[in-house]
Amino acid sequence: GQRVGSMGFPNTNIEILGPTSDDVGWLNAGARIVVHGNAGNGTANAMAQGKIYVAGNIGARGMTMTKHNPRFDPPELWVLGSAGDYFGEFMAGGIAVICGFEAQVPDNILGHRPFVGMVGGKVFFHGPYRGYSRRDAKLISMGDEEWAWLNQNLHVFLDHIGRTELVRVFSDRSQWQLLVARTPQEKIQRPMKSIHSFHTGVWEKELGRGGLIGDLMQLDRSPVPLITTAQLRRYVPIWENRKYAAPCEATCPTGIPVQERWQLVRE
């Protein structure tokens, strides 16, 4: 079912002998979860501690909104195959390892638009990909310490899922890549669009002459200053209290809309 192992506690071991549904390890707080098959969407969503081992592929939005309390070991997600779309969205901590073996999409093991909004954590991956959010994440060279950690824990992962024969497949360090979140100082800033460039490049292009409705309109489309007066004051505020009713109020089957009912209670 859904959310197996959710809010799992430390010293808890859950082993699923087959594929599983969505949200495996949701809000996991320390449990070790082994899935002998594919996992659905939302795997390791908001996980804070613990480990999840998946002997297959995972669906969309895996490892999203994770976090890491420095007092404890970081959460870990190990995937033998590939990740689905929007992987690592708003990831704020933890370690993910995508092995890319028999991936669902062999030429893109990280899925569509991964790591959007990523602010923490790191991801090891083995295989081709089609890009990621460069504004939020960056590739770095893997140091000896990272490789030693990956190599050691890779044996543990393969042992838990019963695929130790794949150790040689993943033993080539040059085939692995490491991606980490950018610091706030490293964030790639988007250029600010001026009002003039928006007016000429977007507004006039879509709504001006030759646009979607520009040829059908005869309205005054000149720029309106911040405080308008005289003829350019296109909207004049008037007081029309209780003149119009919302659809729910007008068609209320009881004849006493909610706001009037509470008004009667107050009175």
Each language-model region and where it sits:
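Ferredoxin-type iron-sulfur electron-transfer modules and their immediate structural context
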Residues: 190-267
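Long, distal/terminal scaffolding or interaction modules
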Residues: 1-205
